[in-house]
Amino acid sequence: MDLKDITIKADGKWYYGNAEMFRRNILNILASHIERDENGAYLIRLGDDVNPITVEDVPFLATGYQETDDGIKLRFHDLQELLLDHELKLTLKGDVPYISYKWEADTRLSRGIYWKLSDYFDFRGDEIYIVPPDVKKG
């Protein structure tokens, strides 16, 4: 498999050539190895093998939400998870919401997740922060 033929579409779906990649366990492995180069381009590094990939918008899409004893957990399309045990800045590009996972504004929130998190919005001037329960406001 030549990884340079991988594209992450704006809707968060992964493609190899024209075929959608739907095996989440494989997506999880690939997504957990995404890096950025000095020019901001995305690549997947597996051992010594480094392959550029095409990302139409951002590499991550939050699609799942779970309240746990440890806090709120977001699950991504690729099965990665982010525990919201700290406040996060919400970035709006037009009407599309983003949060930062590995890099600034690299994760798009699905509409449903955005609305679930809206209970925890803290408006600070022109900025919006997500402050989960039991987290002190900064």
Language model feature labels by segment:
Residues 1-138:
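Terminal leader/tail segments of proteins
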